[in-house]
């Protein structure tokens, strides 16, 4: 089953992030009632918590076109112009990893977002081109990396939090049902406990479970044993997590910086910051200090 098939299409289908979804639903209903345009929206939070899902649900609720871009692929203004000039009125333009936009593109978007006007140069002459009113939705794992003027142009700002285990178990039940799989509540909870509070990781765990049962239909291994084979322990830690923690353990209490950890483990700094550390910090496995990272006492 594809990610798109697993992804909720409406607010009512989204499990978790209730406060965020409720607030956005109020704004969306108000826009529909007043025949208005959804304000520009910034969604911040760790990877895999549903930023893309929420953006897609907003467009579906508004019944408007959705244009999806990744800022990593936008190197200059020319990369984004076709979308801005070709979009239908009231469209949603969703930019994932928006903190990666070059500053020149950020600055170009100021009048686009504020006045719905393109300021471009044609044959060495400045021209202003009116655009249809639209909604820009930005997703980021690093809201503080946006320039202040760009950040301020997002009227709505929401932060996504990690899921609790009961929410993930509920989501697991829903997604497994789409695969034709039914599990006991205790098994659902155990999978949830191994998913780091993150729906994207949960879905990867579910896919592993499904594949394992396809290959071993008569196997009676427990949930724990099935995930032990994948290298996922009872706390959800994987090979990279353990490499990270073992590196700190070998430092014998001496703080290690990101560059040192990356050099020793071979794991990219961005992966450490965005995918490994948030969960380890939240669960108390590590402590960030001014001098570097040290082991905590979970």
Q: Which ranges hold each PLM region?
A:
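Dynamic helix-loop-helix/coil hinge segments at AAA+ ATPase domain boundaries and subdomain interfaces
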Residues: 2-23, 233-235
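Conserved AAA+ ATPase core "coupling" helix
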Residues: 25, 145-179, 184-193, 204-205
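Walker A/P-loop
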Residues: 29-71, 82-89
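Conserved AAA+/SF3 P-loop NTPase catalytic/coupling segment centered on the Walker-B
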Residues: 57-58, 77, 89-120, 143-153
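AAA+/SF3 P-loop NTPase mechanochemical coupling elements
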Residues: 122-139, 154
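Conserved C-terminal helix/linker of AAA+ ATPases
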Residues: 188-189, 206, 210-233, 241, ...
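C-terminal helical "lid" of AAA+/P-loop NTPase domains
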Residues: 189-194, 200-215, 243-246, 260, ...
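Terminal-proximal interaction/regulatory segments of ATP-powered molecular machines
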Residues: 252-298
